[in-house]
């Protein structure tokens, strides 16, 4: 049985979960249920894609503070305190929490991220898009150490960086599984179907993150996130392919030492660490078994076949709202691919076309409205590019 936010038991962290019905959210609830002496749930929020699951989660946790962005889904859940486009943000503002886990998908997580930071709660951030889109605004709103990453790669970096000072850091090595199409040629990728792109070889993730991993856009977003979270120059962040997904990232220091964080691919480990930061949660996930033979491979990324990381590096170096443009153009193009309107390579091609027409958005955003305007522009541009590609490929007719 949970206690109210206002009367949380000493030593128990009050956790507000945004995106509770998604992959990260459901695993976070499992971590919390396994550690009732450490955590209690004080609120749940979801977009509304799975109202039945949200209703079940509410019954399981006993919380009254629930938000649903989709009003129709809110009716299906029943007796929802907050509904509509700003429901999640209002929930964050009204709920006392020690930790806000933002596991929403996409750029819609920006306003809740800023609201969470304004409350002073620790932000366990799985919604990388809000940081990528609103970078300068998010960093300005955050107190030192207030944001704790949930992504396995950035969680790994945070752990590795405990082993040295910032002045001693030489570079960050960001690892990538390579996705389901590692080793495929550019010609091979033309025949990829949404079903193929929805199967990841090592990780269990939501559909959008799985597709982003297949295109390597996810790694591009993580590159930008690395720069923003840890203040590392883009030229000092290497990306290497590690198909086994055991080493989640590495930090190389000026004396030649490299520290790596290794664990079997299981998101419960970084979720638990973010919820309990800086403390570890015993038994969060299985450890590596070094008593059995295994091989860890590290391969160069083929940027010619998978240009998404190079595009992200370009957007990040240009600065301003270009990282928001990168993300929003991808969201629009990815949706078009899933709908069968464009081919798989067209996703990243669309992002590149939009980015290279986005000079007007290179200025740093002064307000959230600046970011939202850049996102709207990017989506409109992407829709135009998608339509042109669809017509050329004969997938739609004018």
From Swiss-Prot:
It is an enzyme of class 1 (oxidoreductase). Signal peptide: none annotated. It catalyses: 2-C-methyl-D-erythritol 4-phosphate + NADP(+) = 1-deoxy-D-xylulose 5-phosphate + NADPH + H(+). NADPH binds at residues 21-24, 47, 50, 127, 129, 206. The keyword Metal-binding applies. Keywords: Isoprene biosynthesis, Manganese, Metal-binding, NADP, Oxidoreductase. 1-deoxy-D-xylulose 5-phosphate binds at residues 128, 152-153, 177, 200, 213, 218-219, 222. GO terms for molecular function: 1-deoxy-D-xylulose-5-phosphate reductoisomerase activity; manganese ion binding; NADPH binding. Mn(2+) binds at residues 151, 153, 222. Pfam families: DXP_redisom_C, DXP_reductoisom, DXPR_C. Its EC number is 1.1.1.267. One of its GO terms (biological process) is isopentenyl diphosphate biosynthetic process, methylerythritol 4-phosphate pathway involved in terpenoid biosynthetic process. The keyword Nucleus does not apply. Pathway: Isoprenoid biosynthesis; isopentenyl diphosphate biosynthesis via DXP pathway; isopentenyl diphosphate from 1-deoxy-D-xylulose 5-phosphate: step 1/6. Its cofactor is Mg(2+); Mn(2+). Belongs to the DXR family. Catalyzes the NADPH-dependent rearrangement and reduction of 1-deoxy-D-xylulose-5-phosphate (DXP) to 2-C-methyl-D-erythritol 4-phosphate (MEP). NCBIfam families: Dxr. This is 1-deoxy-D-xylulose 5-phosphate reductoisomerase. It comes from Mycolicibacterium smegmatis (strain ATCC 700084 / mc(2)155) (Mycobacterium smegmatis). The gene is dxr.
């Amino acid at each position: 049985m949970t206690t109210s936010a206002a009367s949380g038991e000493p030593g128990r962290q009050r956790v507000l979960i945004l995106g509770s019905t998604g992959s990260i959210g459901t695993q976070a609830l499992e971590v919390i249920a396994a550690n009732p002496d450490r955590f209690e749930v004080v609120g749940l929020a979801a977009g509304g894609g799975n109202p039945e699951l949200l209703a079940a989660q509410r019954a399981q946790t006993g919380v009254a503070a629930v938000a649903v962005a989709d009003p129709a889904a809110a009716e299906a859940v029943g007796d929802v305190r907050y509904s509509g486009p700003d429901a999640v943000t209002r929930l964050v503002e009204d709920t006392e929490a020690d930790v806000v886990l933002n596991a929403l998908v996409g750029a819609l997580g920006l306003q809740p991220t800023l609201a969470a930071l304004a409350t002073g709660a620790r932000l366990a951030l799985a919604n990388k898009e809000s940081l990528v889109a609103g970078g300068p605004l998010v960093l300005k709103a955050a107190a030192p150490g207030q944001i704790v990453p949930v992504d396995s790669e950035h969680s790994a970096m945070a752990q590795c960086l405990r082993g040295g000072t910032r002045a001693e850091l030489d570079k960050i090595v960001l690892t990538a599984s390579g996705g389901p199409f590692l080793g495929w040629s550019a010609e091979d990728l033309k025949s990829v179907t949404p079903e193929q792109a929805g199967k990841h070889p090592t990780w269990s993730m939501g559909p959008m993150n799985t597709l982003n991993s297949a295109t390597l856009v996810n790694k591009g977003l993580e590159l930008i996130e690395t720069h923003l979270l840890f203040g590392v120059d883009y030229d000092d962040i290497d990306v290497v392919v590690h198909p086994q997904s055991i080493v989640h990232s590495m930090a190389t220091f000026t004396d030649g030492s490299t520290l790596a964080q290794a664990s079997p691919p299981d998101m419960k480990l970084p979720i638990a660490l973010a919820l309990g930061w800086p403390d570890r949660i015993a038994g969060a996930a299985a450890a590596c078994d070094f008593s059995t033979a295994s091989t860890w491979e590290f391969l160069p990324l083929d940027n010619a076949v998978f240009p998404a990381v190079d595009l992200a590096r370009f957007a990040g170096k240009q600065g301003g709202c270009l990282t928001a443009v990168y993300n929003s153009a991808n969201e629009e193009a990815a949706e078009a691919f899933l709908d069968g309107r464009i081919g798989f390579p067209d996703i990243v091609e669309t992002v590149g076309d939009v980015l290279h027409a986005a000079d007007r958005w290179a200025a740093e955003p002064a307000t959230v409205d600046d970011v939202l305007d850049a996102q709207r522009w990017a989506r409109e541009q992407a829709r135009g590019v998608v339509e042109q590609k669809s017509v050329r490929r004969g997938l739609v007719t004018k």
